[in-house]
Amino acid sequence: MRSNGCGDLREQNIDQQVQLCGWVDRRRDHGGVIFIDLRDRSGTVQITVDPDLGADAFTVAEHLRSETVLQVEGKVRARPGESLNDKLATGAVEVLASGITVLNSVKGNLPFPVSVHDEENTREELRLRHRYLDLRRKRMNDNLRLRAQTIQAARRFLEDAGFIEVETPVLTRSTPEGARDYLLPSRVCGGEWFALPQSPQLFKQLLMVGGIERYYQMARCFRDEDLRADRQPEFTQLDIEMSFMDQEQILELNESLICAIWKTVKGIELPRPFPRITWHDAMEHYGTDRPDTRYGMELTNVSDIVKDMGFKVFSGAVKAGGAVKCIAVPGGNDAVSNVRIKPGGDVFSEAQKAGAGGLAFIRVRDGGEIDTIGAIKDNLSDEQRQELLSRTGAEPGTLLLFGAGDTATVNKALDRVRQYLAKELGMVKADRDNDQWNFLWVVDFPMFEFNGDENRYEALHHPFCAPNAEDLGGDASKWSETLPGARAQAYDLVLNGLELGGGSLRIHDSTLQRQVLQTVGLTLEEAQEQFGFLMDALDVGAPPHGGLAFGVDRMVMLLAGEESIRDTIAFPKTQQARCLMTSAPGGVADKQLEELHVASTWVEPDQED
């Protein structure tokens, strides 16, 4: 049906007879000669239709609409000098049509134009509703190809390294892993339920017990959680697990994997080794465990300097066990006005969204003089002022922004303000123009965090992470005391402020695993009920093992320079977890529910009393 791709034609094809198939991208009538931009997945080429050289083809071309599907026969020739188009890969040639066959026409009006010239002007809701049409756009086509290239590069590397791809079950049982499960009622086993996997975590550990040693999978995962631009209810993760490797070996192997992917997809040699930072230092200096290190403005703790100030906002926060931290914004005096920092201003609002009551500020002038509100200036001694300037490295023109309160809120607020100002002040490029790849390993996470509302410990990652042996100690009788304060042998890979993947060494001893499950609030009976199969497996000679999982959708989003993972998935859901194209989720017949032994209690909001 076709001999060449539209985007493959070059000067070496001149004088060749070709058959092309594709869609009409644009049609232009230049007074007697019609030009058609014909598009397929390989690109676009100009078709010239001259009535003197192809009367039948011209008759067809007169009535063509955008997105009509064509087969074109003709001869490749050089474009005249005045019509050369260096913006097109095929811009040096055109095809003189001798025949045009309409393979399918467009019925009715298109919901939106597909041409690259119009693709920025369509609402996302409309694009998702007609995704099959949206996929014809070059940008979407390129993203899906980049996704395939990324997955192929990962598979090639892992298989060369001795890993084998193993599929794990999609229908499994519900276990407490953090997010809500998607549940499926069993028709055969009435009253019992399957859950879709949030990850293959336990199955990949069981594969290690089974002697597989090196496993990977492009795993489909499902989480019923609140969505945002870089989350979907169903997603793909590159899941990796390996036996008889320590943390250092796992990190080195996965660095090599990432470098291989970036080399294949972007043609970039990434510098190695990737920097590392402990979780504690990340929280102290960036306010987050996902630091963006492309720019400065690190958080500086100044609690000891201001703890005795007469300015009660600062001293009161320290006395209450909180902290006072600040970020130094270079050039901030000119770039950030007082109006923006005060209530109602955009910078103030960013801090407020993170729970802060406000922001204090100091403007550094020539000679180390400062401008600020009177309550700070009147209560800041020369010694304190000098110490602040010295510790923050603030030069004239610098704006110091302060957060005061409980440490968690201060960290969260200043992290948000830091990221916001970096974009506002041009410290980072727009996603599509990004050429900085700042990878960072975050290590030494706490095993647990305390949930004050429920008065219990929760696993910071999951309850299968191995604790640091030094923190745990060798006396099993004291594990209940040492575990809550222990560090996990866990690690996250962060790229430009986004978590790209994470993993850990796993517990391979059933006694320790039971103790960890007890620490997060499970009784021994509950642990056996929910995880008895895992404990049984650990008791038959489980090897030391560990692994990591990368978010494929997020990785492709970063490689493609997109702002949302929805633009890297063929058929994504909205932030309300809906598919606008198929209208999923949807209702089902009562008979189907009866077969599943399920009854719906849902009441439409306008029908409630």
Curated annotation (Swiss-Prot):
- EC numbers for this chain: 6.1.1.23
Q: Which InterPro entries match?
A: Aa-tRNA-synt_II (IPR004364), aa-tRNA-synth_II (IPR006195), aa-tRNA-synth_II/BPL/LPL (IPR045864), Asp-tRNA-ligase_1 (IPR004524), Asp-tRNA-ligase_1_N (IPR047089), Asp/Asn-tRNA-synth_IIb (IPR002312), AspRS_core (IPR047090), GAD-like_sf (IPR004115)
What this protein catalyses is: tRNA(Asx) + L-aspartate + ATP = L-aspartyl-tRNA(Asx) + AMP + diphosphate
Mention any Pfam family matching this sequence. tRNA-synt_2
* Annotated residues for binding of ATP: 223-225, 232, 499, 551-554
Entry keyword set: Aminoacyl-tRNA synthetase, ATP-binding, Cytoplasm, Ligase, Nucleotide-binding, Protein biosynthesis
What EC class does the entry list? Answer: ligase
GO CC terms, sorted: cytoplasm
Q: Where is the signal peptide?
A: none
**Record carries keyword Aminoacyl-tRNA synthetase:** yes
Q: Which GO terms describe its biological process?
A: aspartyl-tRNA aminoacylation
* HAMAP family according to UniProt: Asp_tRNA_synth_type1
**What role is this protein assigned?**
Aspartyl-tRNA synthetase with relaxed tRNA specificity since it is able to aspartylate not only its cognate tRNA(Asp) but also tRNA(Asn). Reaction proceeds in two steps: L-aspartate is first activated by ATP to form Asp-AMP and then transferred to the acceptor end of tRNA(Asp/Asn).
State the PANTHER family in the record: ASPARTATE--TRNA LIGASE, MITOCHONDRIAL (PTHR22594:SF5), ASPARTYL/LYSYL-TRNA SYNTHETASE (PTHR22594)
Per the similarity annotation, which family is this?
A: Belongs to the class-II aminoacyl-tRNA synthetase family. Type 1 subfamily.
What does the subunit section of this Swiss-Prot or TrEMBL entry state? Homodimer.
Q: What is this protein called?
A: Aspartate--tRNA(Asp/Asn) ligase
Q: Which organism is it from?
A: Synechococcus sp. (strain CC9605)
